[in-house]
């Protein structure tokens, strides 16, 4: 009787064992916290799906960040949030340490210098990855340029050329020859950097009242009175106006290129931010803003290994080129930038 009770159990175990051994282990889940708008989240989701399909050990999931929640495995942080994240170092694990412990190659020195600002220590080691940074550029409405007798393949390079273009657009009937999004970022921070003007003194005190800044602000005031420059708000309100075909020229984030290109409502031309050709040494370089990727502290070793693999995936030049093309973000390495420039 005792034997009869044991045999069915043994048989069941024997039958189940081969099938259980065939069952693949579930992938380790890596949460990526973000506060992106729906459109940008969809773009990032496509990139994540590609990583997930290339290997079976890890599954990255995009989750919306809730205020007060502890950091996730991966955290997409804006420039505005960055100071708070740097201050709360105990909540995050330095990226260079994650890569070293996972024995994954990672050379921070290969990343463009302007992208590493504020994300590393004195030794050049990175705390986070500058994955989603953008810079201000000039967008033009090619149809509006053609209507005004302007060459749509030759966007203005200087503010003097911008004035001539705005004048012709206005004469051609445009009610919005030129507009801008993010005015303080474009017309203070980047105007100063692009034209080689300091925005703070040796003690770190802000100084926006230099000759170039005052002259530029006065110029925009004159343009506004002449209806050459139309102001829609201090954030990205002007983006929608340009996307709807209302404006001939727009200065805004390079990350707008993807949505504009995909909407196909406006045939768009893109050029560098205009500079003042009467300022010695101009142009120099614009400033990068946008998103960086931070790693949460207190995660499991297997999760950190997956994070390192995901970061290596993001560093691939071909992927950077593609992401730059669809999202307008800056390629992180000179090699990727060279590849992007050849396409």
What are these language model-derived features?
Residues 22-90, 100-107, 152, 236, ...:
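Conserved N-terminal structural module of periplasmic/extracytoplasmic solute-binding proteins
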Residues 53-54, 148, 223, 229, ...:
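Extracytoplasmic/periplasmic substrate-recognition and gating elements
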Residues 63-70, 157-163, 230-243:
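Short helix-initiation/N-cap motifs at beta->coil->alpha
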Residues 73-78, 248-253, 269:
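Paired acidic/hydrophobic, glycine-rich loop segments that form the ligand-binding mouth/hinge
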Residues 81-137, 163, 269-271:
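Hinge/lid segment of periplasmic solute-binding proteins
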Residues 96-111, 155, 177, 196-215, ...:
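Short, solvent-exposed loop/beta-turn-alpha elements that line the ligand-binding surface or hinge
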Residues 163-168, 203-233:
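Glycine-centered hinge/linker elements that transmit conformational signals in sensory
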Residues 325-343:
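Long, aromatic- and glycine/proline-rich binding clefts that accommodate carbohydrate-like moieties
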């Amino acid at each position: 009787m005792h034997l009869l009770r044991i045999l069915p159990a043994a048989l069941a175990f024997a039958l189940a064992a081969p099938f259980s051994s065939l069952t693949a282990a579930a992938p380790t889940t890596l949460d990526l916290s973000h506060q992106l708008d729906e459109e940008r989240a969809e773009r990032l989701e496509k990139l994540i799906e590609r990583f997930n399909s290339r290997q079976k050990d890890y599954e990255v999931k995009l989750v919306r960040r809730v205020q007060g929640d502890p950091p996730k495995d991966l955290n997409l942080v804006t420039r505005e949030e960055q100071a708070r994240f740097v201050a709360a170092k105990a909540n995050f694990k330095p990226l260079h340490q994650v890569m070293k412990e996972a024995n994954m190659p990672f050379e921070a020195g290969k990343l463009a210098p302007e992208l590493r600002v504020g994300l590393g220590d004195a030794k050049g080691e990175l705390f986070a990855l500058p994955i989603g940074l953008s810079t201000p550029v000039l967008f033009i409405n090619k149809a509006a340029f053609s209507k005004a007798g302007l060459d749509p393949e030759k966007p203005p390079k200087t503010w003097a050329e911008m004035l001539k273009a705005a004048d012709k657009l206005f004469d051609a009937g445009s009610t919005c020859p030129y507009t801008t999004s993010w005015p303080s970022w474009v017309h203070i921070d980047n105007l100063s950097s692009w034209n080689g003007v300091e925005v703070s003194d040796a003690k770190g005190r802000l100084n926006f009242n230099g000759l170039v800044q005052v002259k530029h602000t006065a110029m925009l005031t004159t343009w506004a009175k002449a209806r050459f420059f139309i102001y829609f708000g201090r954030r990205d309100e002007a983006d929608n106006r340009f996307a709807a075909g209302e404006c001939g020229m727009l200065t805004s984030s390079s990350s707008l290129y993807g949505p504009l290109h995909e909407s196909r409502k406006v045939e768009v031309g893109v050029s560098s931010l205009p500079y003042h050709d009467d300022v010695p040494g101009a142009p120099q370089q614009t400033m990068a803003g946008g998103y960086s990727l931070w790693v949460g502290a207190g995660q499991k070793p297997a999760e950190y290994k997956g994070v390192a693999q995901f970061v290596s995936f993001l560093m691939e030049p071909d992927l950077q080129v593609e992401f730059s093309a669809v999202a307008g973000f800056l390629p992180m390495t000179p090699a990727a930038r060279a590849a992007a420039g050849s396409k």
